[in-house]
Amino acid sequence: MGWLDRKDVLQWIDWVLAQDSEAEIVLHGVSMGAATTMMTAGEDTPEQVKVFVEDCGYTSVWDIFSSELKLRFGLPEFPILYTASATARAKAGYGFKEASALQQVQNCEKPMLFIHGTADDFIPYEMMGTLYNAKPGTNKATLTAEGAGHGEAMDVLGDTYWNTVFDFEGQYMAG
């Protein structure tokens, strides 16, 4: 769900920098990759990590599972989510509330671009605003893909998607 994956990403960053200490790194993820990107963003990353781009990520594992239980099945959080979170803690070493992109974004000082489709029926579009508002500083931006479903912003926006991403990155990278 992104929480343990952030540690893998940190190792990949170290590997890249061992190959090229002057590399400029952008972390860009879609869906679960977006969650991993945001969860990594709250960690202490080297100065060569310049920008984070998240596309249709969620606020926390707890929030997305709670939303899915309600929307898809009409079920409350208790007892299912509490039991599943306790099981995850026992098996994976973390609970669902701990795996929070929202908390990690609050610790992120580096630039971040938030992207989301308005017709996403998996990750609520409103989560983008919550995440954006949690990110400190002014080095942040949003890109809304009108009518785009989950993970469809790239397809719906076409060149606008990539032009926005590259323009945002260009503000913070040497070249």
Feature locations, PLM:
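Alpha/beta-hydrolase active-site loop
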Residues: 1-20
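Alpha/beta-hydrolase fold nucleophile elbow
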Residues: 19-31
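Hydrolase active-site cap/lid region
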Residues: 39-94
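Short alpha-helix in the alpha/beta-hydrolase fold that links the catalytic acid
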Residues: 101, 110, 124-133
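Short beta-strand/loop motif that positions the catalytic acidic residue
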Residues: 107-109, 114-116, 120
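Acidic catalytic loop of the alpha/beta-hydrolase fold
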Residues: 118-123, 151-152
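Catalytic histidine neighborhood in serine/cysteine hydrolases
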Residues: 133-152, 164
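Catalytic active-site module of serine/aspartate enzymes centered on a nucleophile-bearing elbow/loop
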Residues: 155-175
